[in-house]
Amino acid sequence: NSGTVLLLVSEGGSSRSRSSWCCNLKQLAFAGLAGDPAWRSQLPLGSDSEMCQVDREKQPNEGAFSENNAENDSSGDKPPIDPNNPAANWLHARSTRKKRCPYTKHQTLELEKEFLFNMYLTRDRRYEVARLLNLTERQVKIWFQNRRMKMKKINKDRAKDE
């Protein structure tokens, strides 16, 4: 479960010396560290540090990681995993963000028409627009937010030119 997070908290004297490390379990799995308890010894933890795990019951077993990441690990161009330096491995972990998918001309035209009619959508109208254009409600909501910011910027630039 990608919602499970490991949180390492170093207990220090001042608020500046206090540090916390958060990582996504998918990143740990990608780095080959999910089932390896030795990775903890490589982190900069003192004797007064403690490790807390949120949602321990929801943590998937190690087999689930290897199944889920089998397709991700298929590319042969990733750097080799160094078990002595897990922090460096996290730098090469892949993002879980979806790829950018530009809107079609039809979708953009319909969204622009809707925006000209009304800059703000009700929940019901957002649902309708999303259904008609085969988009998610979240995509429609964010498109409208971005479009309003674009209009604000255009108006600001126009006022500056005058």
Swiss-Prot record:
Q: Which GO terms describe its molecular function?
A: DNA-binding transcription factor activity, RNA polymerase II-specific; RNA polymerase II cis-regulatory region sequence-specific DNA binding
Q: Please, which domain of life does this record's source organism belong to?
A: Eukaryota
Q: Which residues bind DNA?
A: 96-155
Q: Where in the cell is it found?
A: Nucleus; Cytoplasm
**Which first-to-last residue range defines the signal peptide?**
none
Its predominant location is nucleus
Recorded hits in InterPro entries, A to Z, give:
Abd-B_homeobox_TF, HD, HD_metazoa, Homeobox_CS, Homeodomain-like_sf
Keywords from the UniProt entry: Cytoplasm, Developmental protein, DNA-binding, Homeobox, Nucleus, Transcription, Transcription regulation
Q: Where is this region: Disordered?
A: 56-91
**Gene Ontology BP term (one):** negative regulation of myeloid cell differentiation
Q: Which GO terms describe its cellular component?
A: cytoplasm; nucleus
Q: How does it assemble?
A: Transiently interacts with PRMT5 in TNF-alpha stimulated endothelial cells. Interacts with EIF4E.
Q: What does this protein do?
A: Sequence-specific transcription factor which is part of a developmental regulatory system that provides cells with specific positional identities on the anterior-posterior axis. Required for induction of SELE/E-selectin and VCAM1 on the endothelial cell surface at sites of inflammation. Positively regulates EIF4E-mediated mRNA nuclear export and also increases the translation efficiency of ODC mRNA in the cytoplasm by competing with factors which repress EIF4E activity such as PRH.
Q: Which PANTHER family match?
A: AGAP004664-PA, HOMEOBOX PROTEIN HOX-A9
Under what name is this protein listed? Homeobox protein Hox-A9
Q: What is the native source organism of this protein? A: Cavia porcellus (Guinea pig)
Q: Which gene encodes it?
A: HOXA9
